[in-house]
Amino acid sequence: MKKDIHPAYVETQVTCTCGATFTTRSTATSGTIHADVCSQCHPFYTGKQKILDTGGRVARFEARYAKKAAADAKK
């Protein structure tokens, strides 16, 4: 095997947006990683359901097809 071709594998502190931190090993040169979700705040692991911002999409869908239904009713 060739020597000195692999990146340094160092201890890395992972910080989640919920505030949880844990240490792992990574090739990240800064030694820190910022994660959006972790096992302490992800709904799959916590069993809690988070409400996603789908209300806007549903409202747009209903408005679009309400217009189509109204146009079909006029015909």
From Swiss-Prot:
GO biological process annotation, one example: translation
Cofactor binding description: Binds 1 zinc ion per subunit.
SUPFAM superfamilies cross-referenced by the UniProt entry: L28p-like
Presence of keyword Cell inner membrane: no
Matching Pfam families: Ribosomal_L31
A GO molecular function held by the record: structural constituent of ribosome
Matching Gene3D superfamilies: Ribosomal protein L31
UniProt binding sites for Zn(2+): 16, 18, 38, 41
Coiled coil feature spans: none
Top-level taxon in the UniProt lineage: Bacteria
Cofactor: Zn(2+)
Transmembrane segments: none
InterPro entries associated with the record: Ribosomal_bL28/bL31-like_sf, Ribosomal_bL31, Ribosomal_bL31_A, Ribosomal_bL31_sf
Keywords recorded for this protein, A-Z: Metal-binding, Ribonucleoprotein, Ribosomal protein, RNA-binding, rRNA-binding, Zinc
HAMAP family: Ribosomal_bL31_1
Summary of subunit composition and partner proteins: Part of the 50S ribosomal subunit.
Family: Belongs to the bacterial ribosomal protein bL31 family. Type A subfamily.
Summary of the function given for this chain in its UniProt record: Binds the 23S rRNA.
Alphabetized NCBIfam families for the sequence: L31, PRK00019.1, PRK00528.1
Record's protein name: Large ribosomal subunit protein bL31
Organism encoding this protein: Nocardioides sp. (strain ATCC BAA-499 / JS614)
